[in-house]
């Protein structure tokens, strides 16, 4: 296999080495994997402590530093498998799952070679090979569920090199942070995240799924181009005559349980996956452990810029759960009955968009409003389906990162091949209190910004989950009043800007809903 450009970009972040135009495990690592694959009667890997010893050996063979692991992570493997789960569960994991994972890892080199052989032909010639998909690089990676399982097995055994990942704005991908002893000793949410992932490994070892998952970096270009939608400025939003889409309000339930075909919003960190592989269990982290295939994107997707979003199609859900934050608990097996599309991806579409953290009063500044509405728009909009209602300024400039003409061409190429896939006219957006909670955003402001972005993108509806937030109790009343006024995207945008100006100048302390109803009634 030739050392292709896509493979070259990611090879230093993989545990394999290139040798005589092939990908291989170092001999000593392959020997360890073969030994463990034969089961605990031969390998003696029958406890968390024994597993930690073999992880240490394999990492030494890969020349990986012990100091790169999270503090006391290997002790954490011992604690979890020897103390936190039952003897029966532990015996099954070491007797069945661990050997199967090692057999899967032994196939990783050949799986990757087959992946690259097909990568240029699956999507009508659009490149879809595993590669570093960096900032301002519109593009897609299409992986089989089997290949994802093997990559996540590498994470479980902590085999990924950590060196230089931060230089490319990549998070750590090994599971050592999950097993970090100081966190897990007193943290039930930590052990429940691990239980979700252990359950996933058990499922795929009993029956390997045969579908595919795509990871797409979507870009809203910052420079003007006559043939695609670029980053709108304030005047563009103010001049929009697009009607507002319909809204369905849900005071209970969860985004991932929505019954329609809709984009399901991941309240993302700018680093895709957030704190999934460490201590947090908020919306993004929970989604990543009940749909573990999302974690694979953390291998090759660096930090998002302000004009970028990440869309993932095809991830399977494996676990049920209850609770949120410190009360999060694994709640057993989940059977995902979503249909498959023509690319054998589940019809689950997750869109990752990161809101501004801790914005304070700064969220009412015009630049912040533009940043947030365009961040949402970059995720919800689809270039090849979008009819331009916004009047763009050809001379528009941006204070953000530049986008080259090559990247602009990638945007067009990246979008065109999905015209045969997405039935965009019927696919709405399922979302909730994006950028609120620990992020500190104003929920009344954020829902309106999302409504604008969803409407302008041509989506037919917004399915909004309030999670019982008291601040949104008057939401239905506001929606009815806006509908009676037959407001457009431009009309609502101008009201948001006017309100935000009054908040900044301390001319009002009302929430946006109360302010808007007063404004419209007079």
UniProtKB/Swiss-Prot annotation:
It holds the Pfam family PARG_cat_C. It comes from the Eukaryota. Keywords: Hydrolase. InterPro entries: PARG_cat_C, PARG_helical, Poly_GlycHdrlase. It catalyses: [(1''->2')-ADP-alpha-D-ribose](n) + H2O = [(1''->2')-ADP-alpha-D-ribose](n-1) + ADP-D-ribose. One of its GO terms (biological process) is regulation of DNA repair. Transmembrane segments: none annotated. Its EC number is 3.2.1.143. GO terms for molecular function: poly(ADP-ribose) glycohydrolase activity. The keyword Glycosyltransferase does not apply. Belongs to the poly(ADP-ribose) glycohydrolase family. Poly(ADP-ribose) synthesized after DNA damage is only present transiently and is rapidly degraded by poly(ADP-ribose) glycohydrolase. This is Probable poly(ADP-ribose) glycohydrolase 2. The lineage of its organism: Eukaryota, Viridiplantae, Streptophyta, Embryophyta, Tracheophyta. The gene is PARG2.
